[in-house]
Amino acid sequence: MVEGFSLSLMFLLVSHFFVSGVMSRNFTIENKCDYTVWPGFLTMTTAVSLPTNGFSLKKGESRVINVPPSWSGRLWGRSFCSTSSTGNFSCATGDCGSGKIECSDSGARPPTTLIDFTLDATDGQDFYDVSVVDGYNLPLVVVPQRLGSGRTCSNVGCVVNLNKTCPSELKVMGSSNKEHPIACMNACQKFGLPEFCCYGEYGKPAKCQPTLYSTNFKNECPLAYSYAYDNENNTFRCSNSPNYVITFCPNDISSMSQPSKETNGGTKQKSSWKLKLIVGVSAALTLMILIVVVIIVRTKNMRNSEWNDQNVEAVAMLKRYSYTRVKKMTNSFAHVLGKGGFGTVYKGKLADSGRDVAVKILKVSEGNGEEFINEVASMSRTSHVNIVSLLGFCYEKNKRAIIYEFMPNGSLDKYISANMSTKMEWERLYDVAVGISRGLEYLHNRCVTRIVHFDIKPQNILMDENLCPKISDFGLAKLCKNKESIISMLHMRGTFGYIAPEMFSKNFGAVSHKSDVYSYGMVVLEMIGAKNIEKVEYSGSNNGSMYFPEWVYKDFEKGEITRIFGDSITDEEEKIAKKLVLVALWCIQMNPSDRPPMIKVIEMLEGNLEALQVPPNPLLFSPEETVPDTLEDSDDTSTFFNPSHFERGTLLDSEDVLQHGSRSS
């Protein structure tokens, strides 16, 4: 009797064990990368453990890990790992800090692409997701393997190489190959702001909104978590106790398909007529959509044609040149002045007057050529001593060119570069700063239509024969009707290092002409820093990693002027330098409403130093960069003067400078 009861109880327990799905699983880990990957595991549940917490997978290898019931944890891939002469194991990305291949229950150091699992949770379901909240290092995909009948569970992953599209200031470069990034940081890790990290007053979902950076991640990997309060639907569920295949560097995106098949025979027959109905309706809708699209495209092409043939010339009110004449004036494009994202700039000469000109030939682009229209429409409305003059244009189908006055002394960055043996004197720097401010004030207030430049940087400030500064390159400019104060932006514009914080996140405020004010302030600070780079570099180890504007503010506040301006500065030069610092610090206030308009900037520059107040500290953080120990030779630093901080390329492929002498950004 007892034996029969024991057998029955055992049968019930075993039956429950299998029916409820509480059984061990197999995780098959595959490496399809062109290099070795070291998978790592972190177990969250104390009652269960894995047979290994880390191992090596060479190219093309795979390994099956038996995962116990109710396991909860995460896994990731480590890359570019090595063992030191003392036996310490470390990885450039995803390192868990254990000093060996096994991770010893320690997590991954960001930036790392993460997979989270909770097995046998609510109603016996598995929960799993992929996250780039802590940054990104490797593409991967999770594919559930169905057991028995039922619905096929969803694949999830991030199969795109985000390292290629990573914003330049978030890239982590390898120590051996400094041309190709090996990981992409998240904005919180890079900047440390509450807006990016979702803490403090931004610690609630309603307050912490997606930023430009998290949106970039989301667009590339829509099924992955991109920031702390991302859509909860990115957590996927699966029943029927499946096994899982995790693949690093999957071969194609087809592995991300999400089938949902019913395997019950009766259901197949019942749904066959529904399938035919759906196919028929879909075909009819597709045909209707195609017809509508064709009509829209043809209408748009007709409008574009009208614009191409008539409106450009009517708006610009400038001389229009044929492509043949453009080719002749540049001597068949013989003398290259500079190259950039929008095209190439050549030196030319007008046939009728013999005047030297700069000719920008725009790259062939899809659409209506927004950058061309921006530049022609903007500059045709300007006439100011501190704005480069537009002399004519060419518009022949996909051949587009803009003819400017020639600037023999190149761009401002040439004169404030750390490599220059002689620097501009303080009086000249002051004149340049005033000239730029007058040009911006003219664009913002005294044009028929307000123009916001959105790409103020030293490369876009050209110097004439008398070293008078002239604002150039209006490819990213925006014309504002009725001098509107708030501008609607679909995409961020500008060059990293000079872009106002409200361009990154609406948590800082609205985008407006004050965004140009911020860029202007950063340019002035760079002029000050380049003038005294020796002092900055010799400032001591305590300030070696401090962001330069913050360093200037703290020393200025303490009255330690000589550390900023040097010992040899005269009293008159010191007044100029102080004035430039105060104005620049006012211009880079984080809140746009705290920045002065350009007309006020001119008053501050031309007024008495004693009338200027010291602004609040404009910087809430120091954009220091966390680099793994194995990347100590990396070029990426947080120093203000490192070229990686003021990136020379623009987010929207902004044109480089039109300058004398061949130079590429």
Swiss-Prot record:
GO terms for cellular component: membrane; plasmodesma. Coiled coil: none annotated. It is found in: Membrane. It comes from the Eukaryota. Pfam families: Pkinase, Thaumatin. Expressed in roots. Expressed at low levels in stems. Keywords: ATP-binding, Disulfide bond, Glycoprotein, Kinase, Membrane, Nucleotide-binding, Serine/threonine-protein kinase, Signal, Transferase, Transmembrane, Transmembrane helix. Changing K360R: Loss of kinase activity. It catalyses: L-seryl-[protein] + ATP = O-phospho-L-seryl-[protein] + ADP + H(+); L-threonyl-[protein] + ATP = O-phospho-L-threonyl-[protein] + ADP + H(+). InterPro entries: Kinase-like_dom_sf (IPR011009), LRK10/LRL21-25-like (IPR045874), Osmotin/thaumatin-like_sf (IPR037176), Prot_kinase_dom (IPR000719), Protein_kinase_ATP_BS (IPR017441), Ser/Thr_kinase_AS (IPR008271), Thaumatin (IPR001938), Thaumatin_CS (IPR017949). The gene is PR5K. It is a single-pass type I membrane protein. Residues 25-276 are extracellular. This is PR5-like receptor kinase.
